[in-house]
């Protein structure tokens, strides 16, 4: 009898160890998405939300959405783990360190992060990162800005200075200089992605200095800039970011530098659910060639001839005839070539 009980106990232990979180073998898969701040930012986080909603429409999954902040990342991720998540998406570079930490602590769970900032050290095999050549789309919008500016002064409004936002900034500035070497460009950072009022304040000052086009990469701060452009009216323009933001101010938004976070999330998650395979331990990089970054066509503000020029530039970037800079060092090198 004792031997029989031991055998049953042993089989139970084996069963429990094989049916841990992360497996898709039984039950409805649970996919979680955690963001810094709010999903309703009209750009980056919202794009991720739209992407995962499309996955839910196609697959039978349980979806958990979590809005978080720096001080609660670990506890919120612990909660998603305890809830039985198979796959957890972390949206934004601010999760870079914590993504590695939790993936090492929980090898049975799959993790995926958008916009990680990693150097050469190994990535855990249950973690995958999505990175973007955002500078390529921004190069095109910078070219447009320089071509349509009436004052010869354009600007860039960033959230927090760093690798991710710098790609937009220096791509934009390079595209503008490619179009017009004499264009004047002013860049400002508000130190936050969640401060609408700071975006309003800085944008107001930029417009008063004679800048007529502002490219933002500031999330909710950019919403503040859009509000200012809309209030000031004709002659005050914005270039949106991540998604097509023209609906927010149709008469003021010339175009948007798109970075389709939602599409990349959708592609990877759908493949994971279809195949039950997870190829982690790596970074996946998207750009113009993959159709994930680009710009929004707007015949109302972008003349047909200019659009043709942009299409030609896109081909040159895809064919690597133009290598778009992504930081200060590569930008300065670009200007010398």
From Swiss-Prot:
Lipidated residue numbers (S-diacylglycerol cysteine): 18
UniProt-listed Pfam families: Bmp
Mutagenesis / variant outcome for changing residue 271 to S: In strain: PLi
GO cellular component: plasma membrane
SUPFAM superfamilies: Periplasmic binding protein-like I (SSF53822)
UniProt keyword list: Cell inner membrane, Cell membrane, Lipoprotein, Membrane, Palmitate, Signal, Transport
Impact after mutating residue 194 to D: In strain: PLi
UniProt signal peptide: 1-17
Reported impact of residue 26 to N: In strain: PLi
Topology relative to the membrane: Lipid-anchor
InterPro entries: BMP_lipoprotein, Peripla_BP_I, PnrA-like
Covalent lipid sites (N-palmitoyl cysteine): 18
Keyword Membrane included in the entry's annotation: yes
Subcellular location field: Cell inner membrane
Family: Belongs to the BMP lipoprotein family.
Functional summary from the UniProt entry: Immunogenic protein. May be part of an ABC-type nucleoside uptake system involved in the purine salvage pathway.
Assembly description: Monomer.
Protein name: Basic membrane protein A2
Species this chain originates from: Borrelia garinii subsp. bavariensis (strain ATCC BAA-2496 / DSM 23469 / PBi) (Borreliella bavariensis)
Organism lineage: Bacteria, Pseudomonadati, Spirochaetota, Spirochaetia, Spirochaetales
């Amino acid at each position: 009898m004792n031997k029989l009980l031991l055998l049953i106990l042993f089989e139970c232990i084996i069963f429990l160890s094989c049916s841990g979180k992360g497996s898709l073998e039984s039950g409805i898969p649970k996919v979680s998405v955690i963001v810094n701040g709010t999903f309703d930012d009209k750009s980056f986080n919202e794009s991720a939300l739209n992407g995962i909603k499309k996955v839910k429409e196609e697959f039978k999954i349980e979806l958990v959405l979590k809005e978080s902040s720096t001080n609660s990342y670990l506890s919120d991720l612990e909660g998603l783990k305890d809830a039985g998540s198979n796959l957890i998406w972390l949206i934004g570079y601010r999760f870079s360190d914590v993504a590695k930490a939790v993936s090492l602590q929980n090898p049975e769970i799959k993790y995926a992060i958008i916009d990680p900032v990693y150097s050469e050290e190994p990535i855990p095999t249950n973690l995958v990162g999505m990175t973007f050549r955002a500078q390529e789309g921004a190069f095109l919008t910078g070219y447009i800005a320089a071509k349509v500016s009436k004052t010869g002064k354009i600007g860039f409004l960033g959230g927090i200075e760093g690798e991710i936002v710098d790609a937009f900034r220096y791509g934009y500035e390079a595209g503008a200089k490619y179009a017009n070497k004499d264009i004047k460009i002013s860049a400002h950072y508000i130190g936050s992605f969640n401060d609408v009022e700071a975006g309003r304040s800085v944008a107001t000052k930029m417009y008063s200095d004679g800048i007529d086009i502002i490219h933002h990469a500031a999330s909710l701060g950019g919403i503040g800039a859009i509000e200012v452009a809309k209030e000031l009216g004709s002659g005050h323009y914005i270039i949106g970011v991540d998604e097509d933001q023209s609906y927010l101010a149709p008469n003021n938004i010339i175009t948007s530098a798109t970075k389709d976070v939602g599409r990349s999330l959708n592609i990877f998650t759908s493949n994971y659910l279809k195949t039950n395979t997870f190829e982690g331990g790596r970074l996946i990089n998207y750009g113009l060639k993959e159709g994930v970054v680009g710009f929004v066509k707007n015949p109302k503000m972008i003349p047909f001839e200019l659009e043709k020029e942009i299409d030609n530039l896109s081909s040159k970037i895809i064919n690597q005839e133009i290598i778009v800079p992504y930081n200060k060092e590569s930008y300065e090198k670009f200007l010398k070539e």
